[in-house]
C-alpha cells in the first residue's frame, strides 16, 4: 500500500535512504569474494549512485512537474492486474485512501504535487515541454476512466466513494496544471545539455551527445542503404513500378488488415514463427501459449505504440508477460487510428519483437 513520497523535503529523504543503502552495499562488497556476487553489488552501487546524481541534476535545472493522472493509473494497473493473485486486490483500497488523503497521516497526492511544483516557481528553472503538458491534460480523463475500470473488474466493494473523492481531486489538479504549469511550459523540446546527457546515461548510453550524434548520422545512412536495397528486391518480386524506399513503404502500409481480424492475424503469425523456431531448433519455447491482446484506450494514451506488459517480478507465482497491441494514439484526435502496426508486412517483425522469441 505504499505510495510515492512527495512530502516536504522528500528529495533529502530519498538521498539519505539511498546513501544509507550505498553504505550497506559497499560494506558487503568489501567482504565479498565471489566474482559474480561482487559484480552484482557493483551494478547496484552504480545504479544508486546514478539515481542520486539524476535527482541533483534535475533539481538544478528542471521545474518539478508530475503527471499524477498517469502515475495513479500505472499504480493501480500494476496492483489490480488480472494476472496477479486476487488476494492482493484488497490493498488497493488502502492505497486509494492514501492517494486521496482519507487515510490518517496522509495528504492528498494532488496537493503535494502542487506544493512541490509551486514552491520552486521563482527559482528560474526550466518548465516541462508544452507538448507534454498538453498531452497530459488531453489524456487525463482517459486515465481516470481506465483506473475506474480496474476497480470495477477487480470486484472490490466500498471503493466508489473514495474513488469519487480522488476523481474530484484529479479534476482540480488538471485545472491547476492548465492554469499554473502550462504558462510556465517551454515551447521547445530541447533539454539542457547536462540533463540530456544524464538521460542518455540512465538508458545505458555512456557516450556523449556529440559522439552519439556522429555515430547516429553514420548508422542512419548505413541502415537506409540496406533498406533501399531491400525495397528494390520487394518491388522486383511484386512487379511494382516504383521501387524507391518511400514508395515501397507506402505500398506495404497500404495492405491494411481489417481491425476485427488483426489479433487473429498476429496469433497466426505467432504460430508460424513458433513452428520455425521448433523446426530450426533456435531456442526452447515455453509450453504455455503467448498472450496477445488489444490495448485499452488508457493504455494507448500511456504508451502509443505496441509494447510488452511485464508480469510482477517479485513473488511471481506463474504470471507471464503480454504482447499488447496499440492501434491508436488518443492524443491525436481524429488522426488517432494508426496504420503502422496493422499492415501485413509489419506483423512478422513485431510479433518476433514483442512476443516470441523477443
Language-model region placement:
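N-terminal maturation segment of proteins
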Residues: 1-358
